[in-house]
């Protein structure tokens, strides 16, 4: 199948000049780096032949670091200084981390992002991630014996702007040139699309160590389009470990009293979870300060106690299908991504719900890195004639505030990115020289129920009558999901802009709540919107009529003026009520009642414009 070729700005025009570009899966539990070598994407191993790098960093005395397997080996004995799953903290504040009491770290709530106190000082998730990225960068450079041109780094589909920017910052600290951030499910689709050449509608079910993503993708004629996305940025294999650990401690009547105990129980729980993927029973043994934890765990027990977690993933699948307005029968195949999908209960639940066995052709641990490597190979200009078009989507609608506290959507939810859209707005009052721009994210019709992203002002608008100025507001979302908003007054050219980089992340429960409320309150929201719009139109009409009376009231007889003023009062009184139709009727009555007055004003304006001018000048 011939795929559409896309050339990126700055791409080398020389087809023989090969640049070393890699794909990096910066995962919660482990990370990988892959590259295309001799036309085949492959994960790059370390000196001992291991392709997986545990996402763990241990901080030692004197500024030394232990990274990956070395850090993981000391996790139980030195949990406070061994940071794992740092990806879960990217772009987050302390209040965003619901399970912090279960974690052994000494959290520090610094402005902008939570940090962890270690023996080597306070470390941010960005710094921890940078250590992992630098290790993978050195591995790739050693493998090719050359410097890297750049990297495509994957992120969960539900990472918001703050989390994506934090990932870019970590890459910069690691000395990496980021060619693009792409969603993990999309990277998996790239790998499977190229390997199998299959077209159709696919569900990508990605359950990693700390995040869950479900995406619906349409593969057709070389185009990967993400139709809809969903998920939970704080649900993954780690939560299965915590559930098993809590259950085991409660059953034994013991408590994890120290950080070492907490970490040791979690390590043992993970080992049991992995063993139960191939065995019907496994033994959990941990020496704690309070005593010996020793019990047998069956697969049936484990699946029963973690069923609520599995059900949460299926609820997200249902939501994505509803968003895309497709039935389960239309899904051609299911792609499993993430090591946690090796659990038999996951494969059984997905098969039962979607009615088809998932694709498992590629290693679920490696598939994301392989797809990222293929994309990096193309963006570096190394691929010849077989590039593909990649379309990600915005997870929530983007818009701005208008009069009456209403939200005007500019970019709807699930719009393919990169994208740019613009809309014209105007002034509300005569002589208005500034306009406040309030950028919002969410699915509700009212400002108070949406998330505020940014505020800025456009100043220097030429004074005009209300409605005469034309302000074009442009929204642009780049390939990394970052938003830029520009407001420009068309006649004067004055302009203001903002790039949205929120200082904190959007918690997973907030995302779920915003989407659910947008769905369940849609009918009521539309009624409220109609009422607010009617009130805004009343205010606009009354203001315009008052201004007209002040300027040209001498055109009216006393009785005519009194009639118009009575209609104005009636409209204002009606606007205090809750009946949008009645308000609209009052505004229409005011418009009808001022129609002859408007005609007289127009005639006066024409006479004034033509006064003293000859026919040939007109």
From Swiss-Prot:
**Annotated keywords:** ATP-binding, Chaperone, Nucleotide-binding
Q: Which Pfam families match?
A: HSP70
User: 4Fe-4S: present as a keyword of the record?
Assistant: no
| Gene Ontology molecular functions | ATP binding; ATP hydrolysis activity; ATP-dependent protein folding chaperone; unfolded protein binding
Q: Could you state one GO biological process linked to this protein?
A: iron-sulfur cluster assembly
* Record InterPro entries: ATPase_NBD, Heat_shock_70_CS, HSP70_C_sf, HSP70_peptide-bd_sf, Hsp_70_fam, ISC_FeS_clus_asmbl_HscA
| Source organism, top-level taxon | Bacteria
Q: Which residues cross the membrane?
A: none
The reply to whether Transport figures as a keyword in the UniProt entry is no
Q: Which family does it belong to?
A: Belongs to the heat shock protein 70 family.
Biological function: Chaperone involved in the maturation of iron-sulfur cluster-containing proteins. Has a low intrinsic ATPase activity which is markedly stimulated by HscB.
Name listed for the protein in its UniProt record = Chaperone protein HscA homolog
| Highest classification ranks of the organism | Bacteria, Pseudomonadati, Pseudomonadota, Betaproteobacteria, Burkholderiales
Q: Name the gene that codes for it.
A: hscA
């Amino acid at each position: 199948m011939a795929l559409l070729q896309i050339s990126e700005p700055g791409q080398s025009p020389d087809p023989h000049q090969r640049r070393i570009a890699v794909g990096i899966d910066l995962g919660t539990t482990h990370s990988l780096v892959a590259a295309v070598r001799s036309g085949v994407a492959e994960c790059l191993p370390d000196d001992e032949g291991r392709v997986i790098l545990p996402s763990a960093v241990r901080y030692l005395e004197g500024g030394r670091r232990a990274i990956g397997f070395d850090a993981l080996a000391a996790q139980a004995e030195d949990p406070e200084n061994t940071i794992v799953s740092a990806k879960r903290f990217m772009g987050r504040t302390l209040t965003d981390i619901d399970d912090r009491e279960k974690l052994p770290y000494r959290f520090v709530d610094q402005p902008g992002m939570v940090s962890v106190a270690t023996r080597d000082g306070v470390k941010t998730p960005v710094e921890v991630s940078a250590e992992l990225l630098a290790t993978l960068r050195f591995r790739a450079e050693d493998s090719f014996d050359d410097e890297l041109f750049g990297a495509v780094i994957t992120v969960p589909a539900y990472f918001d702007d703050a989390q994506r920017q934090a990932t870019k910052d970590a890459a910069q600290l690691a000395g990496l040139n980021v060619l693009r951030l792409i969603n993990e499910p999309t990277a998996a689709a790239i790998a499977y699309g190229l390997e199998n050449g299959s077209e159709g509608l696919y569900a990508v079910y990605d359950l990693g160590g700390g995040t869950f993503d479900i995406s619906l993708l349409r593969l057709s004629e070389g185009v990967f389009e993400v139709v809809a996305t969903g998920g939970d940025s704080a649900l993954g294999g780690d939560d299965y470990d915590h559930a098993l650990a809590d259950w085991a401690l409660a059953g034994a009547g013991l408590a994890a009293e120290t950080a070492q105990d907490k970490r040791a129980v979690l390590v043992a729980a993970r080992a049991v979870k992995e063993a139960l993927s191939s065995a019907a029973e496994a033994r959990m043994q941990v020496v704690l300060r309070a005593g010996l934890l020793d019990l047998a765990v069956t697969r049936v027990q484990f699946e029963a106690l973690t069923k609520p977690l599995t059900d949460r993933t299926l609820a997200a699948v249902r939501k994505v299908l509803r968003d895309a307005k497709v039935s389960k029968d239309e899904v051609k195949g299911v792609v499993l991504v993430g090591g946690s999908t090796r659990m038999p209960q996951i494969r059984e639940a997905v098969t039962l719900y979607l009615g088809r066995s998932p694709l498992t052709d590629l290693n679920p641990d490696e598939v994301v890195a392989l797809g990222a490597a293929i994309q990096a190979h193309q963006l570096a200009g190394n691929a010849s004639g077989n590039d593909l078009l990649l379309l990600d989507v915005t997870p929530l609608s983007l818009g701005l505030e208008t009069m009456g506290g209403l939200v005007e959507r500019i970019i709807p939810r699930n719009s393919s990115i990169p994208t740019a859209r613009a809309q014209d707005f105007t002034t509300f009052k005569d002589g208005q020289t500034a306009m406040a721009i309030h950028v919002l994210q969410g699915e509700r019709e009212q400002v108070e129920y949406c998330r505020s992203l940014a505020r800025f002002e456009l100043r220097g608008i030429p004074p005009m009558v209300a409605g005469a100025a034309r302000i074009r507001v442009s929204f642009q979302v780049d390939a990394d999901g970052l938003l830029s908003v520009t407001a420009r007054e068309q006649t004067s050219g004055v302009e203001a802009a903002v790039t949205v980089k929120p200082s904190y992340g959007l918690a997973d429960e907030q995302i779920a709540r915003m989407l659910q409320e947008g769905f369940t309150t849609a009918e009521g929201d539309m009624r409220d919107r109609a009422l607010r719009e009617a009130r805004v139109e009343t205010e606009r009409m009354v203001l315009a009529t008052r201004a007209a009376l002040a300027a040209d009231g001498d055109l009216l007889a006393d009785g005519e003026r009194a009639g118009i003023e009575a209609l104005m009062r009636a409209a204002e009184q009606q606007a205090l009520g809750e009946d949008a139709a009645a308000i609209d009727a009052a505004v229409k009555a005011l418009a009808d009642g001022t129609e002859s007055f408007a005609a007289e004003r127009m005639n006066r304006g024409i006479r004034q414009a033509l006064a003293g001018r000859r026919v040939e000048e007109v």
